[in-house]
Amino acid sequence: MGLSTYVGTFLLCILTLSHCKSGKEEYGTVIGIDLGTTYSCVGVFKNGRVEIIANDQGNRITPSYVAFSGDGERLIGDAAKNQLTSNPKNTLFDAKRLIGRDYDDKDVQGDIKRYPFKVINKNNKPYMKVQVGSEEKGFAPEEVSAMVLSKMKEIAEAYLGTEVTHAVVTVPAYFNDAQRQATKDAGAIAGLTVLRIINEPTAAAIAYGLDKKDTEKNILVFDLGGGTFDVSLLTIDNGVFEVVATSGDTHLGGEDFDQRLIDYFVKLYKKKEGKDITKDDRAVQKLRREVEKAKRTLSTEHSTMIEIDNLFEGKDFSEPLTRARFEELNNDLFRSTLKPVMKVMEDSGLKKEDIDDIVLVGGSTRIPKIQQLVKEFFNVKEPSRGINPDEAVAYGAAVQAGVISGVEDTGDIVLLDVCPLTMGIETVGGVMTKLIPRNTVIPTKKSQIFSTAADNQPTVTIQVFEGERPMTKDNHFLGKFDLTGIPPAPRGLPQIEVTFEIDVNGILRVSAEDKGTGKKSNIVINKETNRLTPEEIERMIQDAEKFSDQDKQVKERVEVRNDLESLAYSIKNQVKDKEKMGGKLSDDEIKTIEDAADEAIKWMENNPQAETSDYKKQKANLESVVQPIVSKLYEGAAPPTESTPKEEL
């Protein structure tokens, strides 16, 4: 771990603690919200402990559903979900699966096919369309999430007896920047200032580790909810919760298991009755409601009955479902949850026996087969049973809210999260120059000096990428900006300081400064930026492993070419400088060196696709001409360079 990381960690500790002193007066009571795909939960740190707050129906978790009745009345939570089967086209859910994504996203297109409500394309963003009274209205996923957040705000205010304006909201660890920004926007729409976005497995680790602050432990959090899946590996040591590695899938959860059951029963009905019930939205939603109940029953029973009155065209439906059949239908999905577990183990460098505790979070971890797979992976190690999987994330968010608002008994907790992907910029030859490696603790800030690639270059373009491959063409483009007004100077002379800064919410800001003139420019990678889908993240990581040898060869070739080019131009500049080397050589010697450098430059222009060995040979040829001449001046030493070499933009 480098010096800059230690400094970042230390500063975070100070900022967290000093923040506490003034937070209470500024924010009032800060609540913690777990904004889930299928259910949401709210908590508050009060009287020295976390209170998970029940809604007006007495339930501690609230469905993430919004509906509009025939007369335009808006229903949120239990009331909305309860009328799903009678009003399917005007009942909205799954906003979390759409938020921050493009309309043409593969997962979005797959989800649209099973929704009873319409999803329309508005500027390549998915909008959820319903009938509100006499008019049709399209809602952005942020708006629907905002309605759910406003319900959680209302639940907290009813319990506290005071207005709530600030919150900590959780998101899946693998949410990208666009999804995080969109979640913050949803909070603002709901009248909440989202002080912090924290990762769900990290929040769960806080819930687990709050009473274990004095011991050092390695914790693996396995968070499988209704629509998303995360795995994070953390260390807990003296109140410091540090994420070591994270992985996951923002499109895997209990709803996918339900869909497998729905597909199975639809086929079964068609086989027996010769009719397709998918043409009737009400029938499908009735079936969805019953398979969800059956799935829950099968967590404790080995068999159950799916019984639905008047399912389709006046006919009742009754079919058995066993736990074995449920597991068979979802076998591939269940087993796919182990891939991110393997990934975080690999990234952390820890062995299975190094894991002190496994924390299961999210309602889907109640499925016995999931528990069995995790247990077997860790050599029959029993997962921790100390926390409620439905409430753990909101619990941790409430603790973090307490830290921010200055509540006593939380001041010694420090939360250190990580960025899930490497961030960097493109340098000469299309090389991905990494500034912030994957799994770096955030918040973090990293700067590096670069220079120009051509003489008298007035502008440099900073192109920002994320990904694990050595070449930018294989990574994901985030954005770009120009730094202009660079005074005329030989290539390699200007000093351009590029700074990457990731804040506590995982949001990236990139700036560039010409150290000579002080001129600056920057970009914030925000919700308008086309950030990665989780599938692209997983593909990049897999590709990085698959093509690692090929990548090394390509990178070596570009580096050797850059070395040759830098040497040729550096030598030319030095022999022109009469104050230095140029003043100590004869005209014939200067011409010999310049001709050799020009020949190397011309060869590179004529051979852009040359192999690594060819570049090395050309460099050796150039050195064989230059070395004997300058060795007389420097007693056999290599020619001096003007300064420490800098990568070129």
From Swiss-Prot:
Record has Signal as a keyword: yes
Taxonomy, superkingdom: Eukaryota
EC number in record: 3.6.4.10
Record's signal peptide: 1-20
Annotated catalysed reactions: ATP + H2O = ADP + phosphate + H(+)
Molecular function terms from GO: ATP binding; ATP hydrolysis activity; ATP-dependent protein folding chaperone
Record region (Nucleotide-binding (NBD)): 125-279
UniProt note on regulation of activity: The chaperone activity is regulated by ATP-induced allosteric coupling of the nucleotide-binding (NBD) and substrate-binding (SBD) domains. In the ADP-bound and nucleotide-free (apo) states, the two domains have little interaction. In contrast, in the ATP-bound state the two domains are tightly coupled, which results in drastically accelerated kinetics in both binding and release of polypeptide substrates. J domain-containing co-chaperones stimulate the ATPase activity and are required for efficient substrate recognition.
Assigned GO CC terms: endoplasmic reticulum lumen
Residues that coordinate or bind ATP: 36-39, 96, 226-228, 292-299, 363-366
Motif Prevents secretion from ER in this chain: 646-649
Cell compartment(s), UniProt: Endoplasmic reticulum lumen
Keywords: ATP-binding, Chaperone, Endoplasmic reticulum, Hydrolase, Nucleotide-binding, Signal
Region named Substrate-binding (SBD): 399-499
Function in brief: Endoplasmic reticulum chaperone that plays a key role in protein folding and quality control in the endoplasmic reticulum lumen. Involved in the correct folding of proteins and degradation of misfolded proteins. Acts as a key repressor of the unfolded protein response (UPR).
Protein family membership: Belongs to the heat shock protein 70 family.
Protein name: Endoplasmic reticulum chaperone BiP
